[in-house]
Amino acid sequence: MLSLDFLDDVRRMNKRQLYYQVLNFGMIVSSALMIWKGLMVITGSESPIVVVLSGSMEPAFHRGDLLFLTNRVEDPIRVGEIVVFRIEGREIPIVHRVLKIHEKQDGHIKFLTKGDNNAVDDRGLYKQGQHWLEKKDVVGRARGFVPYIGIVTILMNDYPKFKYAVLFLLGLFVLVHRE
């Protein structure tokens, strides 16, 4: 009966109240987008916050940990650093540790990664013929984390009905909530 109460509240609103609530919802969404874009500029990363999706980095990071990233051009990549990188042809970025660095005479740096919980390096994950990653492949470097808070994101991706139910309820709450 909880959802019916929400619908009754929406029906009882006059047009002005409903318009105000829709605008309020729009302000919340646009504020979230502005905060995200601001974080992108400050951190230099296209994705300043990511969720660890697998157990390949255990015990350092667990599935569902939320990572905060930076990607400043002037900072050199070092062995032992945890980086988030994209592989051509794959949509989801990977969180792994830098295992080796290969520096050419011209100063161009390439590096090899490996998950802490994996037996072998990541060459099998890279696109065919690629043996090293380059700076352009890096989304960011881990600078901090919050344990397990990202499990909500994993649940929403694994169970789409759960995601739509949560989004629907949040939207209804914003529309019905009166200040």
From Swiss-Prot:
<dbReference type="GO" id="GO:0004252">
    <property type="term" value="F:serine-type endopeptidase activity"/>
</dbReference>
<feature type="topological domain" description="Lumenal">
    <location>
        <begin position="37"/>
        <end position="179"/>
    </location>
</feature>
<keyword id="KW-0812">Transmembrane</keyword>
<dbReference type="InterPro" id="IPR036286">
    <property type="entry name" value="LexA/Signal_pep-like_sf"/>
</dbReference>
<dbReference type="InterPro" id="IPR015927">
    <property type="entry name" value="Peptidase_S24_S26A/B/C"/>
</dbReference>
<comment type="function">
    <text>Catalytic component of the signal peptidase complex (SPC) which catalyzes the cleavage of N-terminal signal sequences from nascent proteins as they are translocated into the lumen of the endoplasmic reticulum. Specifically cleaves N-terminal signal peptides that contain a hydrophobic alpha-helix (h-region) shorter than 18-20 amino acids.</text>
</comment>
<feature type="region of interest" description="C-terminal short (CTS) helix">
    <location>
        <begin position="165"/>
        <end position="176"/>
    </location>
</feature>
<dbReference type="InterPro" id="IPR019756">
    <property type="entry name" value="Pept_S26A_signal_pept_1_Ser-AS"/>
</dbReference>
<comment type="subunit">
    <text>Component of the signal peptidase complex paralog A (SPC-A) composed of a catalytic subunit SEC11A and three accessory subunits SPCS1, SPCS2 and SPCS3. Within the complex, interacts with SPCS2 and SPCS3. The complex induces a local thinning of the ER membrane which is used to measure the length of the signal peptide (SP) h-region of protein substrates. This ensures the selectivity of the complex towards h-regions shorter than 18-20 amino acids.</text>
</comment>
<dbReference type="GO" id="GO:0005787">
    <property type="term" value="C:signal peptidase complex"/>
</dbReference>
<keyword id="KW-0472">Membrane</keyword>
<dbReference type="InterPro" id="IPR019533">
    <property type="entry name" value="Peptidase_S26"/>
</dbReference>
<dbReference type="Pfam" id="PF00717">
    <property type="entry name" value="Peptidase_S24"/>
</dbReference>
<feature type="active site" description="Charge relay system">
    <location>
        <position position="96"/>
    </location>
</feature>
<protein>
    <recommendedName>
        <fullName>Signal peptidase complex catalytic subunit SEC11A</fullName>
        <ecNumber>3.4.21.89</ecNumber>
    </recommendedName>
</protein>
<keyword id="KW-0645">Protease</keyword>
<dbReference type="InterPro" id="IPR019758">
    <property type="entry name" value="Pept_S26A_signal_pept_1_CS"/>
</dbReference>
<dbReference type="GO" id="GO:0006465">
    <property type="term" value="P:signal peptide processing"/>
</dbReference>
<feature type="topological domain" description="Cytoplasmic">
    <location>
        <begin position="1"/>
        <end position="16"/>
    </location>
</feature>
<keyword id="KW-0256">Endoplasmic reticulum</keyword>
<keyword id="KW-1133">Transmembrane helix</keyword>
<dbReference type="InterPro" id="IPR001733">
    <property type="entry name" value="Peptidase_S26B"/>
</dbReference>
<feature type="active site" description="Charge relay system">
    <location>
        <position position="122"/>
    </location>
</feature>
<feature type="active site" description="Charge relay system">
    <location>
        <position position="56"/>
    </location>
</feature>
<keyword id="KW-0378">Hydrolase</keyword>
<feature type="transmembrane region" description="Helical; Signal-anchor for type II membrane protein">
    <location>
        <begin position="17"/>
        <end position="36"/>
    </location>
</feature>
<keyword id="KW-0735">Signal-anchor</keyword>
<comment type="similarity">
    <text>Belongs to the peptidase S26B family.</text>
</comment>
